[in-house]
């Protein structure tokens, strides 16, 4: 079974909302260098506690603010085929996130957006 392993919060001004999440939830932020977009890693708690960490970034052109969950998959290519066969749509094609893996974004048949991540520390 594939699980949600990451979330992303999209906002027009990522720097301005960081204090909110820090003060309300105690989350910490670290800017991620080397990716395709300006991105902050969000740590929501100790790795020994249940839960997931995420990211904070600006929406892509035409995308609204909001939250997207990312699901870990063993093969991004196979999963993208299954999505299209099942009536879903690939919105952002496969791209490398250096030293982390391969990422794509898709919609289910109802239009709900989600991310897919195939871990691969050799991704470039």
Regions found by a protein language model. Name each.
Residues 1-18, 66-71, 119-124:
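N-terminal beta-strand motif that seeds the catalytic metal site of vicinal oxygen chelate
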Residues 54-56, 114-115:
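Conserved beta-strand in the GNAT
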Residues 4, 51-54, 66-68, 101:
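Structural motif
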């Amino acid at each position: 079974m594939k699980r949600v392993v990451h979330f992303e919060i999209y906002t027009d001004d990522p720097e301005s909302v960081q204090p909110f999440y820090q003060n309300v939830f105690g989350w910490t932020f670290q800017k991620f260098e080397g990716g395709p977009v300006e991105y902050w890693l969000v740590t929501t708690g100790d790795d020994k506690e249940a839960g997931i960490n995420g990211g904070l970034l600006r929406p892509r052109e035409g995308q609204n603010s909001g939250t997207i969950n990312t699901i870990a998959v063993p093969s991004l290519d196979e999963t993208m085929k299954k999505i299209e066969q099942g009536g879903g749509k690939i919105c952002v094609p496969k791209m490398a996130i250096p030293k982390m893996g391969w990422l794509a974004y898709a919609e289910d048949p109802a239009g709900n957006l989600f991310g897919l991540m195939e871990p691969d520390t050799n991704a470039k």
